[in-house]
Design a protein with these regions (language model features):
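Bacterial N-terminal signal peptides that target proteins for export
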Residues: 2-10
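Ser/Thr-rich, Proline-interspersed low-complexity disordered segments
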Residues: 16, 21-47
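Acidic/aromatic-lined carbohydrate-recognition and catalytic surfaces
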Residues: 21-23, 47-228, 235, 251-296, ...
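Alpha-helical scaffolding within the catalytic cores
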Residues: 44-49, 193, 232, 293-297, ...
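Loop/helix patches that line or flank the sugar-binding groove of alpha-linked glycan CAZymes
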Residues: 54, 275-281, 286, 292-293, ...
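A structural motif
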Residues: 96, 101, 242-243, 305, ...
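Short glycine/proline- and charge-enriched loop/turn segments
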Residues: 117-126, 306-316, 400-403
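Core domains of carbohydrate- and sulfate-ester-processing enzymes
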Residues: 167-212, 216, 319-338, 402-429
Length: 491
């Protein structure tokens, strides 16, 4: 039985869902959250379980190409990120004009023939568009000064067709031939979502397996040389470069077993061995996996990576806010906590593959604020997609989800002095960081307050998630509770 002692209770109020069950606010009132003293409550006296560093931080996803250009070539780079580190976190916990994030996830930084970088040509080098390895190490050093951790995208499943391994593998006599999956004839088995996965190679008239498209051939993880090589790649980035961990792309597809091409027992087992491998190098290494499927299947990977993205939860938060259906949000969190009771999962609203939140909400800032409140005060490790905090918009195709960051209202949005690699969103003159800095009621400052609140309260980072009953379905009410720290969130 738990024992309890008295503690102060912090109450968060947010006037969007509440407005559905009460008279509407005047148009001049800007919805925001308020922190006020409330009646004391009881909390457990038992010591909380120790948490890992990633459970104590808010992450920020950066597409390097689109974040900040330092040299005028129109392409974001490592030096550009360095220039903006103080915006992300100035390293001083007493200040509140930075965003307050504690870790960065950099989308692929390896050399690649594509703009996005998910078809790698060299696993132990950086994309020259972004700078040199020395530039990247400088970024790591500057981030460390501010207590910012840095993880990178690790594309384990496939390479580019331009990778030297694949080029060599086209020769059936090459020792690299079995690094990929080849067939003399075209198998008729469709891919996991009924797509074509066997692609003809003009150089040898054979067919190779690639689950995503013909420019990304899958590596053959049945080959022990491939498995050993990817362990060496992992070790390189941890020991020789010094990153803090990895976001694992396309984790579901490493091994096929007959006609089953995703979530096989061999894939799940490999990740468990991989985790043991990198923890032996540095127990503080962090990995988060992209396992884009339902919660039940995602949970099978929980022993192979430190955290996993909750795609169903993201949809339930966004759509629950859209429809003013708090019950959907609460039920989704409860489902996740059934499989991850320690809260060791990753929450987000959108990423580089999904419609931006502000586009979903039709530029409704109030709904964007509420969605932010829900996931930044909820359990799990939050991941913010760059530009989300200022309400950048973006709809498919993918290039439009990854446009340059909107820093100012000048002709190039403060992103570059040259020609941006991709046009900015047309609304950048009205939606930009410089403009939102000036008004305390903007989405940007709402994000700042929420992140700093989360940083200040252990209950938000690792406390119990206790939904409270309400006679109004539109009211979102939960208690976050950890030892003497308690927060009541009502929206």
């Amino acid at each position: 039985m738990k024992t309890y002692r008295k503690s102060a209770l912090i109450l968060l109020l947010f006037a969007i869902f509440l407005a559905a069950c009460a008279p509407r606010l005047p148009a001049t009132v800007a919805p925001t959250f308020t922190v006020v003293p409330a009646t004391p409550t009881s909390t457990p006296t038992s010591e909380p379980d120790p948490v890992s560093w990633w459970q104590d931080r808010v992450f920020y996803e950066i597409f390097v190409r689109s974040f900040k250009d330092s040299d005028g070539d129109g392409i974001g780079d490592f030096q550009g990120i360095i220039q903006q580190l103080d915006y992300l976190n100035d390293g001083d916990p007493t200040t509140h004009d930075d965003l307050g994030v504690g870790a960065l996830w950099l989308m692929p930084i390896n050399p690649s023939p594509s703009y996005h970088g998910y078809d790698v040509t060299d696993y132990t080098a950086v994309n020259p568009d972004y700078g040199t390895m020395d530039d990247f190490k400088q970024l790591l050093a500057e981030a460390e000064k501010r207590d910012i951790k840095v993880i990178i995208d690790l594309v384990l499943n496939h390479t580019s067709t331009e990778h030297p391994w694949f080029q060599a593998s086209q020769d059936p006599e090459s020792p690299f031939h079995d690094w990929y999956v080849w067939s003399d004839t075209k198998p008729q088995t469709p891919g996991p979502w009924s797509q074509t996965v066997w692609h003809r190679n003009a150089a040898n008239n054979l067919y190779y397996y690639g689950v995503f498209w013909d420019g990304m051939p899958d590596l053959n993880y049945d080959n022990p040389d491939v498995r050993a090589e990817m362990l060496d790649v992992t070790k390189f980035w941890l020991e020789e470069v010094g990153v803090d961990g990895f976001r694992v792309d396309a984790a579901r597809y490493l091994f096929a077993e007959g006609s089953v091409q995703q979530d096989t027992e061999s894939t799940i087992a490999w990740f468990e061995d991989w985790r043991d491998f990198y923890k032996a190098i540095d127990p503080e290494t962090f990995s988060v996996g992209e396992v884009w499927t339902n919660l039940q299947v995602t949970a099978k990977y929980s022993e192979g990576m430190d955290s996993l993205f909750m795609f169903d939860l993201a949809e339930d938060i966004k759509n629950g806010v859209y429809a003013a259906d708090s019950a959907r949000i609460v039920a989704s969190y409860q489902d996740v906590l059934t499989y991850f009771p320690d809260g060791n999962f990753s929450a987000f609203l959108s990423n580089h593959d999904q419609q931006r939140v502000m586009s979903l909400y039709g530029r409704n800032v109030e709904k964007a604020k509420l969605a932010a409140l829900v996931y930044l005060t909820g359990p799990g490790t939050p991941f913010i997609y760059y530009g989300e905090e200022i309400g950048m918009t973006g709809n498919k195709p993918d290039e439009n989800l990854r446009r340059p960051m909107q820093w100012t209202d000048d002709a190039r949005g403060g992103f570059t002095t040259g020609t941006p690699w991709q046009p900015l969103e047309p609304d950048f003159e009205e939606v930009n960081l410089a403009l939102q800095n000036e008004n305390p009621n903007t989405l940007l400052n709402h994000y700042r307050r929420l992140i700093h609140l989360r940083n200040a309260h252990p209950a938000l980072r690792g406390g119990e998630y206790l939904p409270l009953s309400s006679s109004c379905r539109q009211v979102y009410a939960v208690l976050r509770l950890l030892e003497e720290d308690a927060l009541l969130i009502i929206a």
